[in-house]
Amino acid sequence: MYKKIIQKQNGHFVSCIEQIPGSCKGIVIAVHGFSSSKECSTYQVLLRKLPAAGLGMIGIDLPGHGKDESYEEILRIEGCKDSIASVEEYICRTYPDLPVYYFGSSFGAYIIGLYLSTREHVGRKAFFRSAAVNMPDLFIKENPTAEEQEKLRQMKEKGFFYHSIDDEHQPVKITQGFFQDLETNDLFRIFDAARYGNNKVEMAHGMKDTVIDPEKARDFAEKFQIPIHFFENEGHSLGGAADTPDNVVDLAVHFFSK
C-alpha cells in the first residue's frame, strides 16, 4: 500500500491510498464516512481483504477530510463527486482493461449514490455500508438541540462551524453552502441506478444503528429494489463483533465478483 495524490480539474487534490495486486481483476474506489478519512479502520479491512480476492483498491479522502491534501478543499457535494470522478479517470487511464467498483460507508455511500445518479461513470456495481440514505436529516432539523442551535448561530455569524460525528474523528468545516447542497440532494428523490447505465447495488446495515435508522435503510432498499443485508446486533460502525467488519467486506467481494 502506498499513498497517492491525484489532481482534480478544479486545481484541488485527492489524497488517496492505493493497493493493486498482481493479476488484478478490478479496482474498488472506497469512500469513507463523514469526518472520517483514509486512515479509517474500514479501509484497513479492505486493504487486507480485497487484494487477497484479486481486487485492487484506491481509498480516498473526501474534501475537507483527513490531514493531507484533500483537507484544503471546502466540503461541497459536487466537490465530493469530482473527487470520485478524478480517481475514476486515473484508473481508466492507468488500468484501462479493469472494471471499476464502488464501496461507500455512511456519508460516502450517500455521495456514491448521488454520483451514480448524476454523473457519467464507468463502474457498474456499488456496495453501500451503513448508507446515510437520509443524510440531509442529520443536519437540517425542525427542532434542533441547543448544541445544534449554537452551531447554526456560529454559521450565521462566521459563515461556518466545525462538526464531527464523535470525539474520535477530526472535525469538518461545515459551511452554508454545504447546507444548501443537502437541501437539494435528497437521495430518496434523486437516486436512479439506471440513468447512466445498468448499475447494481447491494447494502449492509446494522439493526441497532442509532445514526441512520435501519428502517430508513430498509425503505430505501425496498423503494429501489436493492438487496440489503442486516446485521442483527450491530450499530452504525458494523464493528461490534470482531468478525463483522470482515463479514461485511466478504459480502462486498462476493457481490463484486459475481
Predicted regions and their residues:
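The alpha/beta-hydrolase serine catalytic core
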Residues: 110, 122-219, 223, 227-230, ...
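Short beta-strand immediately N-terminal to the catalytic nucleophile in serine-hydrolase-like folds
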Residues: 102-104, 129
